Structures are given as C-alpha cells and as structure tokens.
Amino acid sequence: MLWAALAYSVGIVAGEYAWRPAHWWVVGALAFAMAAAYFAQRRVCLGRALVLGAVFLVGALHVQVRGAATHFDTSIQELADGRELQIMAHVIRDGQSRPASFGEIRQAVDVETEQVTADGAPGLPVRSGIRLTIYGSHAREALDEDSEESPGAIPLRLFHYGERIHFSAKLRPPRNFRNPGAFDYQGYLAANGIAALGSAKAENIESLPGFAGSRIELWRSRMHRSVIAKVHALWPARVAALIDAMVIGEEAFIDRDTRTDFQRSGTYHILVVSGMNVSILAFVVFWTLRRLRVGDVPATLLTVCGCVGYAFLTEVGAPVWRATLMCAIYLGTRLLYRERAMLNALGAAALGLLVFEPRQLFTASFQMTFVCVLIVAAIGLPTLERTSEFYKRALAHWQSEDYGKSLPPRVAQFRVDLRLIAGRTRQFVGRQWSLRLVRLSARFALGAFALLFISAVMQMGLALPMAYYFHRATTVALPANVLVVPLTQLMMPAAVATIALGYVSPWLARIPALVTTIAVQAITGTVRGLGGLRLADIRVPTPSTMMVLAAAGALVLAMVMARRRAPAAIVGLLAVFAAALALGFIAPLPNIRANVLEITSIDVGQGDSTLLVTPQGRTLLVDAGGPIGEGSSQLDFGEDVVSPYLWWRGISRLDAVAITHGHSDHIGGMAAVLKNFRPRELWVGLLPPSAALENLIAEAQSLGIKVVRHWQGDAFALGGANISVLWPARDAPPGAKPQNNDSLVLRVSYIDSAALLEGDAQKQAERDITARYHPTADLLRVGHHGSANATTPELLESVKPRFAVISVGSRNPFRLPRREVLDRLERSGARVFRTDTEGAVTFYLDGHSVTPSLAALR
C-alpha cells in the first residue's frame, strides 16, 4: 500500500505541473493495467511495476479532472465591490469571542448566504461562504452568553451553528499580500468554502426563525461548546486556554507569545491537537480495555470508535482524521497479524485521503503528518528492533537460564550481567527488591534510549519541512520533546478524565484536575525555559532547490538503509544528520543581482516597507509595515508579511534597518524583523515620546544591534551606493508624539541613477528639502501613501522622476492614493506603480537606467 500511495502521489504532482489531455492519462492507465494483468503470473515483479504505473497515471488523471474546484458560488465575488448588501444567511462555523480594538470584542463566524440583495433590486439566491466578523462593545470577560460556569455576561450575543440571520454589510474579496513567499490566504479560505469577507455590528444583525444545517453538526457544535465551558469551569483561565488548545483543538484563547514559545522550542505539535493526541488516546483506551480483560476484537472496535468520536468532537480537521484513519487501519491489520502493519496503514491512509482530495498532497499539514509517521516506521522502529527492543525482549523470563540458551550470545550475556548486578545489590535491599529494581532500571534505560532516538531521528527528518515552511531550525527540540512528550502522555488522559468526571461531580474531578494542572505547568515551564534561549531562535531562509533535493534524498537513503546491516544504517543516519545541519546552519546564496542598486517596495497593505540591496550585496530595510493606528491586529506584519519575503530571497541577515518615523504602519513589524534577521545597525531620526519607539530601541539594544541617529546633511556609502539624509533637520525639536514630518528622508544613488525615499514626509518637509537640496531622482518613493498633503508640485519639478511607486492598501478607508496626486505624477511624466494593484515592485538601477519588475509577473 505504501508503494501505491507513493505512485499515486507522484502522479498527482505530474498531473498538477505537466498538463496533458485527459484521454492521454486514461489510455495510458488502461494500457498499463492490461499489461499488468498479462504479466501478473508470468513475471511478477514486472506486473507489480506496471500496476504502480497505472496507479501513477490514475493519480495524474484524478487531479486534472478534479481541477481547482471551488466550494462556493463565485457570483458573490461580483457583489463584493464595496456596495452595501442586504444578506440572509445561516451560520456554518462559529467561533469564540476575542478582544478587538478600542475596547470592543469580536466573534468571527462563517456563514452561508441564502439570499443577497443589492441596490434595492430583487434578492438573488446565492449559496456562498462569507467569513463575517461581528463586533460588540465594552465586554466583560466571559466564555459564553449562556455559560453558567463563567461569571458575567458579554453584551455581544454569540451566534452559533445553524442560526439564520439577516444583516447588512460591505463585502470584499480576500486578498493575499502579493509578495513572493507569502501565505496563500485566499487559497486557504477558498479551500474552506469562503469567497468573501465582511463585518457587521452585533446590534445590526437580526435573528431569523428556523434552523439551517445538519442536526449532527448542531449536536457536535453544542458538545464542543459544552466541553470548553466545562474546561473553563474546572481550571483557571490560563491553564484552561492551554487545555482548550492541547486537548480540544480550540486555539482562540492562546496568545501569540505562547504560540511562539512552542514554535521556537520545536514542540508546537504539543500545543495543537494532532496525530499524537489520537495515538495517546488510542493507547490508553486499548490498554485499559485489555487490562479489564476485554477481547482483542471488541477492544479494537471500541478504541477506533473512541478515536472517531474524539476527531468528531475536536473538529480540528484533516490532521486528526488522518491519524484516526491510520489508527483504524493499523489496529485492523494488527488483528490480521500482518508484518510491517504500520507502513501498510500509512500507505492505505495516504491513498484513501488523496483519492478523497488530491490537492491536500501540497499542504504542509499533510506532508508533515506522513513524514513523521514514515520516519518512525521506516527508520525509527527498524533501528530500535536491533537495539533497545532486541534487549528488551531479553528481560522476559530473565532469571531462567534455559530461556537464555535460545538467545543470541550478546543478549544472553546481557541477561547474565543483569543477574550479576542484582546479586551485588541483594545485600542492600534483599533478593526480591534487587531483582525488581534491576529489571525496572533496565526497562527505564531502554525506554529512555528509545524515546531519545525516536525524538532525535524525528527532529532531523523534519528539519527540511521546518526550514521550508516555517523557516526555523529547532535546535532545542530534542531536549524539549524528551521532557514534554512524557508530560503530555500524562496530561492527556488526566484532562479527559477530569472533563468526564466534571459532568458527574466537580469533587470527583479534583484529583485528575490537579494532575493535569501540574503537567500543563511543567510543559509550559519547560517550553518557556528552552524556547526563551537565544540558541532556540534560529530562523533560516527558504532552502534552495538543490538543498531540498539533497535533504529529501538523505531521508530516503536512511529509510532504505535502516533494515540493512549496521554500517549501512549508520551511513543513512549520518546523511540525515548532515542534511539537518546544512539546513540549519548553511545559508543559501541570496537571490540578488550584482552591480545594480535594487529597491523593492514590499506589499504590506496600508503601510510601508522597502528593501534596498546595494551593488555589492549589502542590505537595508526601511520600515516593516504594521497595523493602522494603535488597535490590535491578528497579523504581525514583520513575522507574517515582511520576513517571508526576505526568506524567499535567501536573506538570512540584514546589514541595517531604518525606521522613518514612529507610526504603527511603519514600525509595527520591525520588532519581529530585528529578532529574525539580527541587523548590525538600526537607523533612526527624530525620537518623540512613544512607548512603541522606546520598546523597539530597547529590543535592538538587547539584541546587540547598534542604534545610529541620522540627521539632515549626513552622507555616507553603503556597499557601493551613496546615501544622503535630507530630513529631519538636526535642530528640529521632537513633538509630543510621532508625526509624519518626523520622517527620515533618504536619497540613495549609484553612479548616475538615484532614488528618493520619502517615508511619510509632507509639504513642510518637502519644501525644505526642495529649497535646500534641489534633489533629482529617477525613482520616487511617494510620500504618505499618495496623500494630498505630500508629493507637492515643487518637489516633482525638482526631482523629475521617471518612475514612482506608492505603497498603499487595497480598498483602504482613506481612499489613497488621491486623484490629484496621481494627476501630478502623470503631468510630471512619471510612470506610477502601486502595491495594491501590482503587489511587490522591484526597481533595478544600473547606474544609467531603471528597470521595473513586478513580483506578480515572475
């Protein structure tokens, strides 16, 4: 089954990237199938190879026939143009309430539209998914409006699955940040059936009579909410939030810092419900049933039913269902006494899931789930069978000399050594205790070795997906997992027992609740302690294609060699170890052009971020985007938007970063950039009183980054480019708070070509710059996102730009860039580029000319 799954997977990849007419695949599959039938009895190996060829062709056919099918009516996207719409819908996925900006709270729900009315026209029957954010105000902390366990109530009434509602909203289509390396948010929503985004005030939502949806899902949703309410009644809020995530799969109450600690320590799989939860649950249930003398078949059936029920309750999605399917197949094949049942279970589960949805092959979740199990089954277990498991079997009847005669010499000698140790300790603790202690010590040592080895192989094998998808080298993952995994194995059954007993009597739940609390606090303490080490925070660029192939090849080599002689197995393990080291500590060559000055305006929405690469390869990042205003944002623009682009470019460290001024849409993402890329210098200009600026400078100093103040008149070289600081004036007093005219304005030149970077400078600064310097530039980074109070005619007359780029957010509430600014730029003869329409824009200045390049066209 494993070979069939691999052939089907390769076929899916071929079908996705090498399109051919469908009849090609059909004819090929039929030809291979008939040839396989002909050779089935004559030449068995050839027949099997032909069967795999047919499976390969069926995989290619399947992914092309399925196409990029959407799960919604695309007509809703035609209505998502800013018009006020009247919408009738029903909730298909509810969520918890969370704090929002300015003292409000929000609940994100997915709704399926029933009828949409626009401009007073008759309602259109539209079936499509919308992610709706509902806002309320002045909330008190509570879990649910009808939760008896939580004190207080939230003014925002939470909406639940199946409720029919009517509301008015302006819809907008989901939009990706159009930078290479960016997360495909639009594709993620489409895969979940979401075609548009919208928001509404709670008081403007009208409840409609009736119910829409599945009664089974309604029951599941109610059970899910009930369990979460019970968790928050049994544990303090901080512990409850972690149990929600670790046991139930509800991550709404986990803050970003906690999430980052688990990621840095390489234990993120502990924080989220994953296949490990299913395996722990299956083991505990099966072991308990067998100890109660339940038969093998009934115990297997009850265990599988328990896993299915758990997957249904958590609603985590594909990872848990994949693990449940693998568990069911593994336990089923175990009943048939099939060898290597784990590999067969893995192949069958993968094949079944890919037949259901072939494109999940390209998701990080699918790949990491199956790579984990494949590493354990193909490398870990075969190695343990000849090491720790080999000796563990020697502990059976270990006092019997006759039993030892049938064992290999080294194992028999191991038994003799244990008996000698027991004999020497007998005088201290007695004969029976000495025998028990020696046997328990041997079992513990062998178990510890197995845990260490599996954890080490797992971390080495996962180095490639961790580097490629998450840009992390998990240097402390081995000790963290060795400490945390056993605690999780204790916490999981204790938490389940606590919740179950909590429905009977809170008094009965106290002891397992205490055990759970101790385990959770030990887990978080370990994670924070190890994740907080500087050694743990190693970020890596996207590996090169050659590095990906080499690391994957090393993993395959280790799997092939694991069942061969010991020297061959060691060679395979060393290859995986070398690949993991290379991924973590050997940076790829950056994707830059030599002997040109590059200026890239990164798409950060309604913010600002510019990457400069000098002719000699030195790098400078000016600003790092951020949210508008002081409100909270679900995005960390530095971590989620700017850093992925820099990693895609192969950049592992920046030479310098600059902040033009202290507004959040320019510096909101800079803290993450400082941590991820450890620049040598941080350039600043005016520093008015600002907690955000003070925190940023303190962060830079704690990281050993030199803070450099720059003023009008400063001029210096950087990697073959010349930089002149045109603003702020050296004698300019800082205001009471950050202002646009605090902006650090830079002119960067290379031979006879130059660029002017304005930040958010406005008329006052522009007039002073024009009068003092009369700057010229081929490229103008338009000030203040194209606002009318910047980009004055006087500046344009002096600069005479051939190109201009505006960093602006799509459908921004400020209606930027202003029409009059675009008209001024057009009259000046500048060709205008905008990040809201073109995405990231790169300009190459070779000293004599400027060449623009759009990321969307690469």
Model-derived regions: residue spans:
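Non-globular, low-confidence helical/coil segments that flank catalytic cores
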Residues: 157, 164, 168, 188, ...
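Membrane-interface helix/helix-cap signal primarily in integral membrane proteins
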Residues: 58-269, 629, 637-647, 653, ...
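Hydrophobic alpha-helical segments of integral membrane proteins
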Residues: 219-231, 242, 250, 258, ...
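Hydrophobic alpha-helical transmembrane segments
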Residues: 1-4, 215, 247-252, 314-320, ...
